Amino acid sequence: MAAPTGKLLVHRIRAGLTCLTQVRWSRYSPQYLDPETDKQVYSRPLEELSEQERTERELKIVRPIKAAPSNVTSSVFSDPTISKFTNMMMKGGNKNLSRSIMNQTLEQIKRTQLEKYYKAPEEERASIECNPYTIFHQALHNCQPIIGLTSILRGGKSYQVPTPLKENRRRFLAMKWLITECRDNKHRRTLMYEKLSQALLDAYQMQGEVVKKKHELHKMAEANRAFAHFRWW
């Protein structure tokens, strides 16, 4: 009996594997639970937990847990928003440099605010924020636009239609504007962390070019409000 040709052999192999289901990029079966890295969740007593939370804690005793991602930690300095900003600032895969710039930026903000704190009179010190993480989050919130513009084609003509932005899109635009402003409009002798720390402090006080860019986008959306009915496509 002659040996089967290549195509016939492949057909027989595929016919014998029809009962198998291909699972791509899957390390864990559905019975594995997601890991919980927040220490405060485990420190709460059972009396304060709801019925659902108590059931979930009992399930974690008997069911296997997935391994935590390498970028997730239970450290008090872990911040998902800052990690996202660090990844967006990264160029060429050099995350160590991006992380170093972010740490230097937070340190520079801390030094600037402490200097301002000690120079201020005693009655004004309570109003000066010295936590760089609080300043970063508030500055990012001040840079987030509420409404954006979407290009809609109607009758062969393109219209810029104002549309509300989702939370992820707002955060992305704020981060992108901050990074672009610090890269494109800084002096060649000014370091990246110096420019970024100053941009964050300006945005914290509702000042700076990034906040102006947000207001300009809102003005353009207000000018194109006549095309808002095109949003229901």
Swiss-Prot record:
**Record carries keyword Transit peptide:** yes
Task: Write down the superkingdom of origin.
Answer: Eukaryota
**Key word Phosphoprotein present:** no
Task: Keywords in alphabetical order, please.
Answer: Mitochondrion, Ribonucleoprotein, Ribosomal protein, Transit peptide
Q: Which Pfam families match?
A: Ribosomal_S7 (PF00177)
- Gene Ontology annotations for the cellular component aspect, listed alphabetically: mitochondrial small ribosomal subunit; ribosome
Q: Name one GO molecular function term.
A: rRNA binding
Task: Write out the GO biological process terms.
Answer: mitochondrial translation; ribosomal small subunit assembly; translation
Localization of this protein: Mitochondrion
Residue range covered by the transit peptide = 1-28
Subunit composition and interactions: Component of the mitochondrial ribosome small subunit (28S) which comprises a 12S rRNA and about 30 distinct proteins.
> Per the similarity annotation, which family is this?
Belongs to the universal ribosomal protein uS7 family.
Name this protein carries in UniProt: Small ribosomal subunit protein uS7m
Gene designation: mrps7
